[in-house]
From Swiss-Prot:
Pathway: Metabolic intermediate biosynthesis; chorismate biosynthesis; chorismate from D-erythrose 4-phosphate and phosphoenolpyruvate: step 4/7. The keyword Endoplasmic reticulum does not apply. Belongs to the shikimate dehydrogenase family. This is Shikimate dehydrogenase (NADP(+)). Involved in the biosynthesis of the chorismate, which leads to the biosynthesis of aromatic amino acids. Catalyzes the reversible NADPH linked reduction of 3-dehydroshikimate (DHSA) to yield shikimate (SA).
């Protein structure tokens, strides 16, 4: 079977390394490549994919929303998130999914087993936040709060959860067991701080969905305060495993995928 990841730029993507490690571990001869498709060429997506004879693909920035009009069917989770990151090609039909939310929550559950009883704060209200919020709401809806700079961003959310400003989030930070940053603040080359951690409880797990850098500024600050921290590496691995399951109906080798990504990040 043939798979790919599509984005622009895409040369930095660790998806090929991760998926190939999984294929090797499972004894599969499947292939996975990175395809750079600029925005101005995206209208050719059907033609490009057809020539590659792909069975499915991942789609990343900046095309997660742009792909939707080209799909024959969109899964409920992707509709809720307003974005697609996985496409299955079956009987010439393109079916879109979003595995980011379930990928993050599966990873979080592995390090925080008592998720159902946690009070959780999500920082940011973009596509990633939306997907994660919809998945977390299955566990902790009454205890889930999302904070954003502007409240207008929530107008498209069809989810009845607590919504507050970032200023209020800073004020009530001590009340949360888990704080999740879903904003681009802290990504490689971006040292912006999304929120002041002055009131962060020492028992709070501080999380960021970014994994490059391995520790974002907000995670470093929380760690200096003595908090446990959790980056986006597991989310990346688990969302990839969920994509593989959609394409093949097989379980992925999580350990081989995570090891391959860690080795790449360490330059091994």
């Amino acid at each position: 079977m043939k798979f790919a990841v599509i984005g622009n730029p895409i040369s930095h993507s660790l998806s090929p390394v991760m998926h190939r490690a999984n294929f090797n571990s499972l004894g599969l001869d499947d292939t996975y490549e990175a395809l750079n498709i600029p925005i101005e060429d995206f209208h050719l997506i059907k033609e490009i994919i057809s020539k590659k004879e792909l069975d499915g693909f991942n789609i990343t920035i900046p095309h997660k929303e742009r792909i939707i009009p080209y799909l024959d069917h969109v899964d409920e989770q992707a509709i809720n998130a307003g974005a697609v990151n996985t496409v299955l090609i079956k009987d010439d039909k393109w079916i879109g999914y979003n595995t980011d939310g379930i990928g993050y929550v599966k990873g979080l559950h592995s390090v925080y087993p008592d998720l159902e009883n946690a009070y959780i704060l999500i920082l940011g209200a973009g596509g990633a936040s939306k997907g994660i919020a919809y998945e977390l709401a299955k566990f902790v809806k009454p205890k889930l709060t999302v904070a954003n700079r502007t409240m207008a961003r929530f107008e498209s959310w069809n989810l009845n959860i607590n919504q507050i400003s970032l200023a209020d989030a800073e004020k009530y930070l001590a009340e949360f067991d888990i704080v999740i940053n879903t904003t681009p603040a802290g990504m490689a080359g971006n040292n912006e701080s999304i929120i002041n951690l002055k009131h962060l409880s020492p028992n709070t797990l501080m999380s960021d969905i970014v994994y490059i850098p391995y520790k974002t500024p907000i995670l470093e600050e929380a760690e200096r305060k003595g908090n446990h921290i959790y980056n986006g590496l597991d989310m990346f691995v688990y969302q990839g495993a969920e994509s593989f399951k959609i394409w093949t109906n097989k379980d992925a080798d999580i350990n081989s995928m995570k090891t391959a990504v860690l080795q790449q990040l360490k330059g091994e």
